[in-house]
Amino acid sequence: MSRSLKKGPYVEASLLKKVEELNQKNEKRVIKTWSRRSTIFPQFVGHTFAVHDGRKHIPVYVTEDMVGHKLGEFAPTRTFKGHAGSEKSSRLR
């Protein structure tokens, strides 16, 4: 279920403040964040965020196509190592 339109998009206030300060200074710097739930605003385009995946911070460079999505969508939390190998192939060798 999506968020109510009357509420508007959510973004962590401290994250928005950091981006606004960097935009005023014309700086590009990696912004470390744990806020995976924050919506990507148009002001974020061109910035790199280090989004926490539960273990480490994944660098995410924001483009125009990402506006409206959440930061957490671009930093996967699960790593798939693959299914166990077939026992038949290991027995034949």
From Swiss-Prot:
Pfam families: Ribosomal_S19. GO terms for biological process: ribosomal small subunit assembly; translation. The keyword Acyltransferase does not apply. Keywords: Ribonucleoprotein, Ribosomal protein, RNA-binding, rRNA-binding. SUPFAM superfamilies: Ribosomal protein S19. GO terms for molecular function: rRNA binding; structural constituent of ribosome. It comes from the Bacteria. InterPro entries: Ribosomal_uS19, Ribosomal_uS19_bac-type, Ribosomal_uS19_CS, Ribosomal_uS19_SF. GO terms for cellular component: cytoplasm; small ribosomal subunit. Protein S19 forms a complex with S13 that binds strongly to the 16S ribosomal RNA. HAMAP family: Ribosomal_uS19. Belongs to the universal ribosomal protein uS19 family. This is Small ribosomal subunit protein uS19. It comes from Heliobacterium modesticaldum (strain ATCC 51547 / Ice1). The gene is rpsS.
